[in-house]
């Protein structure tokens, strides 16, 4: 079964619409531009998540010239994901997410729509309901875990021609 987001107002909204038709214990979402993500990383992250009690898990790799920068807390859980499209990243290198997220369906069905309605996850630049902002919000009170992958290509997303040139520099 397919669902459609009639108004392009962010990934959080797109995910929430999909959740209305989801009945599985877990759901998985991937950004459509994530051409570098390997099936091995997807499989390992799903297995990792399904054995955990985290509301969300995602793979991340250490790279230079990050698009996102993953910050962890003292217990190694997600503290925040910074996005270069929203703000200047303070570091040249660090953990970058891979655009793939494993999540607890019940938790997100219960909480994501309320968070969207509250307007707390509207991005400054795109004015869309941002799923990364939702993860950052939930990370303040719930366990979200990153799974390290050594495959830097897993982080590669292509939106523009210039992004293809990153293939040369990613290793």
Regions found by a protein language model. Give the residues of each.
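Conserved N-terminal catalytic core of the sugar/cofactor nucleotidyltransferase
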Residues: 1-40
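Conserved beta-strand termini and adjacent loop/short-helix elements that scaffold enzyme active sites
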Residues: 3-6, 59, 147-150
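A short acidic, often aromatic-flanked loop/helix-cap motif at beta-alpha or helix-coil junctions
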Residues: 8-12, 65, 153-155
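Residue-level signal for inorganic ion chemistry
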Residues: 18, 33, 70, 104, ...
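Short, high-confidence coil segments that cap the C-terminus of an alpha-helix
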Residues: 23-24, 51-56, 142
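Conserved alpha/beta core of the MobA/IspD/sugar-nucleotide pyrophosphorylase nucleotidyltransferase superfamily
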Residues: 24, 94-171
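Conserved core of the sugar-phosphate nucleotidyltransferase
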Residues: 37-122, 129
